[in-house]
């Protein structure tokens, strides 16, 4: 790693070396370079816990799997219950978080999954993780505030964050300013109606805890495969909670072939 960091230092300026040291290799703490000498030091205030044990299978946007619940656990130094005072008055929250499972460099153009993974568009016209500052923004539904001995917890639903993703900030969703029903979504518009038919035989489905069945089916409906992979003969696999789920996709139908308990 020392040789790699040394080569980066020789190729790019001092500001960018800070980016690679703190973001790419140590994503849990971050120093972002915002401009000419302007620095913002951020660190996680919380981590999210859920059944998305790997990025393969995580919904591509928040709200696509509303039945999946997650727990937000606050870090030491951010467990003061006063920080959550009156938060229960809001139905939805914004989460500012880091792409902790993204080890790639940012790119000026990216290939959105819903364009087949072939057409390139500008990174700022997408929600791709390959961004100059590796930050994500998601709207989740606040289900419950739990008082626990080790600090308050937030139970949320509809998150598109992998398990143990660092959260840097939490803000209330304000429908009178944040909602724009007449907004135009460009090439992302067809995603709203996209869903696969899921064939899940009773024998295999019975291996899944009943409380997790609907959530898993919803995840599969939105096609967890990488956009560039479309081989009907290939058996794909993804991990969800304590299970390995294997499946094939033909046209608009996803068929679960195996379920293994981890």
Question: Positions of the model-derived regions?
Answer:
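A conserved acidic, glycine/proline-rich C-terminal tail/linker
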Residues: 213-239
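Enriched for short, Lys/Arg-rich terminal
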Residues: 250-262
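Short, conserved beta-turn/loop elements at beta-strand boundaries and strand-helix junctions
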Residues: 53, 145-151
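Cationic, low-complexity basic patches in intrinsically disordered or flexible, solvent-exposed regions
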Residues: 2-3, 25
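Active-site-adjacent substructure of cysteine-protease-like catalytic cores
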Residues: 38, 83, 87-136, 228-230
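Short solvent-exposed strand/turn elements
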Residues: 150-173, 260-262
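Arg/Lys-rich, positively charged N-terminal/basic patches that mediate binding to nucleic acids
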Residues: 31, 37-81, 87-89, 173-218, ...
